[in-house]
Regions:
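Basic, ligand-binding patches in group-transfer machinery
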Residues: 21
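Structured, basic alpha/beta domains of bacterial-type, RNA-associated proteins
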Residues: 2-10, 24, 28-31, 35-167
Length: 167
């Protein structure tokens, strides 16, 4: 292939359609805090979402205008981005989103599916899975495995122990 490595996934679309798709995915991510899509689309939207949160954390007019240009419905999603999401990730250096591979959502093509979500949010799947495992271990009277202890440490790092004990 001429030109060296590929810098992004083309997603079988031309440039305008690809940008429109990614803007739509990121807008839905900000609105609902998690989306279910294909793995390739999730990884590309993750890049744009990380940049969007970084723009929101700067809290200046150029960053606000750039974020407004990315989001499709800025009147509803920009206040959430600049308020709730910005405050949630002020102390975090990066890694605001997570891509979790899931079973294929389409039975006819078996394409790779994934969930793109914000970390430390109310719909955080790692937090829910860890809480479920801890509840099962407590009910059975078993010790936590090393993987479970690591996951407990990760999900409570920025969230604190209180929400985990409430589950």
């Amino acid at each position: 292939m001429a030109g060296g490595t590929v810098k992004y996934r083309h997603l079988s679309r031309n440039s305008a359609a690809r940008v429109a798709l990614l803007r739509g995915l990121v807008t839905q991510l900000v609105q609902f805090e998690h989306i279910h899509t294909t793995y390739a689309k999730a990884k590309e939207a993750q890049r744009m979402a990380e940049k969007l949160i970084t723009l929101a954390k700067r809290d200046n007019e150029p960053g606000r205008r750039s974020a407004q240009g990315i989001l499709y419905t800025p009147t509803t999603t920009l206040p959430k981005l600049l308020g709730e999401l910005r405050n949630r990730y002020l102390t975090r250096e990066g890694g605001y989103t997570r891509v979790v591979r899931t079973e294929s959502k389409n039975t006819y093509d078996q394409g790779e599916s994934a969930i793109l979500e914000f970390v430390d949010g109310p719909k955080d799947s790692r937090f829910m899975m860890t809480a479920k495992t801890v509840a099962r271990d407590r009910m059975l009277g078993q010790e936590h495995t090393p993987v479970t202890r690591t996951n407990i440490k990760k999900v409570t790092q920025f969230r604190g122990e209180v929400p985990f004990e409430e589950m």
